[in-house]
């Protein structure tokens, strides 16, 4: 013992042992130990009280440290195994090419608080905040970096069907829409206070998106919002006044989804009538109608310019469109279990088959090479556009139930998180740049799959 402990440490250990024996009412043993250690009358009741409980604290600390060591050893072994199984090329790509990074299991966080199915998720454009909407009529705000609930926002009287962050520069707002026929605007800078309610739709409002600044006819940059409804219409709103500035008609049934182009010039909508439609955002006039799906189209998205080289090659073109063009290619996902890629004239380029149930959400990878999808088959799939849309990765354990939504955070590639959601009660956040939402029959989760590229790792 003298080789391991200093004289002071040895003295404290001896006194702790004696104090422990006294507290255990083993007085004879305590006296014997004092005699053997030559600890005299200086060890009085005050000294005994000082050292009482110290031995137990040291013991429990050792147990905690042993557990921590075991956990770290297990994590180290898993990381070593990953390194051993990786090729030099894959390691190089992981460390130098975030544009090729793809999500993987396990989830980083599992966020639980909703009491019914989660229907939608959205990232704050600046802060590490994540909003989730649910059939329990609430919106919950989470810190997706910490995996903690920050706030529950109440106001809707029926299921919240979609949420989106946006608004004028320097004045970010949260918009939500609901089966209660309303759209509500919330102020993140004031504890998500409800600052405006937009009535006008005649049925459930299924989707809502801020239109990026630059749209022709915008009364003020960043002030436009578009909504899609079961009343078969799209409506464009001025969030500064709350007025509906345009109603767009053309769909023959429920409009399930709407997406603006990156410059705000075009709108893409899709719905139960099995069509996707491209509209001029300033005039509301149709540009193209996409026909081919055999069931309800659940989701639609414009391809970013970074995807143009891959999609142009897939379409058989020698030269991709100019990056300044914002509505050249489109992807749609439907209840016919297929994903279809189109050009802006409505020509079908490719049909991607692989999901076993309804396609619920699509996002293009910020690097442009991949298209990611989630579906009611509980999977997240990654399609390589440079390989004719080949499915190069499937996360089969993304959720324990239907995966109902997915979003990629509006950020630079190295920071951009992805979020997808499901009918359940928890939210796993996966290592990477994004988030996913998971739900089961007992409640609602948000599976925030933070799909961050490995540079830097978090």
From Swiss-Prot:
Gene Ontology BP terms: cell division; establishment of mitotic spindle orientation; microtubule organizing center organization; microtubule sliding; nuclear migration; vesicle transport along microtubule
Subcellular location: Cytoplasm, Cytoskeleton; Cytoplasm, Cytoskeleton, Spindle pole
Species for this entry: Sclerotinia sclerotiorum (strain ATCC 18683 / 1980 / Ss-1)
Gene Ontology terms, MF aspect: dynein complex binding; microtubule plus-end binding
Residue ranges of coiled coil: 60-87
Keywords, ordered alphabetically: Cell cycle, Cell division, Coiled coil, Cytoplasm, Cytoskeleton, Microtubule, Mitosis, Repeat, Transport, WD repeat
Domain comment quoted from the record: Dimerization mediated by the LisH domain may be required to activate dynein.
Domain LisH: start-end pairs: 9-41
Presence of the UniProt keyword Coiled coil in the record: yes
Subunit structure, as described in the record: Self-associates. Interacts with ndl1 and dynein.
Record's compositionally biased regions (Basic and acidic residues): 436-445
Entry keyword annotation includes Transcription: no
A GO CC annotation given for this chain: microtubule associated complex
Protein's name according to its UniProt entry: Nuclear distribution protein PAC1
Protein purpose: Positively regulates the activity of the minus-end directed microtubule motor protein dynein. May enhance dynein-mediated microtubule sliding by targeting dynein to the microtubule plus end. Required for nuclear migration during vegetative growth as well as development. Required for retrograde early endosome (EE) transport from the hyphal tip. Required for localization of dynein to the mitotic spindle poles. Recruits additional proteins to the dynein complex at SPBs.
Family from the record: Belongs to the WD repeat LIS1/nudF family.
Compositional bias (Polar residues): 81-98
WD repeats: 113-152, 155-196, 200-247, 250-289, 292-352, 354-393, 398-440
Region (Disordered): 81-101, 424-446
SUPFAM superfamilies noted in UniProt: Lissencephaly-1 protein (Lis-1, PAF-AH alpha) N-terminal domain, WD40 repeat-like
């Amino acid at each position: 013992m003298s080789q391991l402990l200093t004289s002071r440490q040895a003295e404290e250990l001896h006194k702790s042992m004696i104090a422990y024996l006294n507290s255990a009412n083993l007085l004879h043993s305590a006296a014997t130990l004092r005699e053997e250690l030559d600890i005299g009358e200086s060890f009085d009741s005050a000294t005994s009280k000082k050292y009482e409980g110290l031995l137990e604290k040291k013991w429990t600390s050792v147990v905690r440290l042993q557990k921590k060591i075991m956990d770290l050893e297990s994590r180290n072994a898993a990381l070593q195994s990953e390194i051993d199984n990786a090729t030099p090329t894959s390691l190089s790509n992981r460390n130098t090419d975030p544009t090729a990074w793809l999500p993987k299991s396990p989830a980083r966080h599992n966020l639980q608080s909703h009491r019914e199915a989660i229907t939608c998720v959205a990232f704050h454009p600046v802060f590490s905040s994540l909003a989730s909407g649910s059939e329990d009529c609430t919106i919950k705000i989470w810190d997706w970096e910490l995996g903690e609930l920050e706030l529950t926002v109440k106001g809707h009287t029926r299921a919240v069907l979609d949420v989106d962050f946006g608004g004028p520069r320097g004045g970010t707002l949260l918009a939500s829409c609901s089966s209660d026929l309303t759209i509500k605007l919330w102020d993140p800078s004031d504890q998500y206070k409800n600052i405006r309610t937009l009535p006008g739709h005649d049925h459930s409002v299924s989707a809502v998106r801020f239109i990026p600044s630059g749209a022709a006819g915008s009364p003020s940059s960043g002030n436009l919002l578009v909504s899609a409804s079961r009343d078969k219409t799209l409506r464009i709103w001025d969030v500064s006044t709350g007025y509906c500035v345009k109603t767009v008609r053309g769909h023959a049934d429920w409009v399930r989804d709407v997406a603006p182009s990156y410059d705000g010039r075009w709108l893409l909508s899709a719905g139960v009538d099995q069509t996707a439609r491209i509209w001029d955002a300033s005039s509301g006039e149709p540009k193209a109608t996409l026909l081919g799906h055999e069931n309800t189209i659940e989701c639609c998205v414009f391809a970013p310019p970074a995807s143009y080289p891959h999609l142009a090659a897939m379409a058989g073109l020698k030269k991709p469109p100019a990056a300044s063009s914002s509505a050249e290619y489109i992807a749609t996902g439907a209840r016919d279990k297929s994903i279809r890629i189109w050009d802006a004239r409505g020509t079908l380029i490719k049909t991607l088959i692989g999901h076993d149930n309804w396609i619920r959400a699509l996002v293009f990878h910020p690097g442009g090479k991949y298209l990611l999808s989630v579906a009611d088959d509980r999977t997240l799939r990654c399609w390589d556009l440079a390989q004719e849309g080949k499915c190069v990765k499937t996360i089969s354990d993304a959720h324990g139930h239907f995966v109902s939504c997915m979003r990629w955070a509006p950020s630079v590639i190295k920071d951009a998180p992805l979020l997808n959601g499901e009918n359940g009660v928890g939210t796993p956040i996966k290592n990477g740049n994004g988030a996913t939402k998971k739900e089961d029959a007992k409640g609602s989760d948000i599976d925030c799959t933070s799909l961050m590229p490995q540079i830097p790792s978090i």
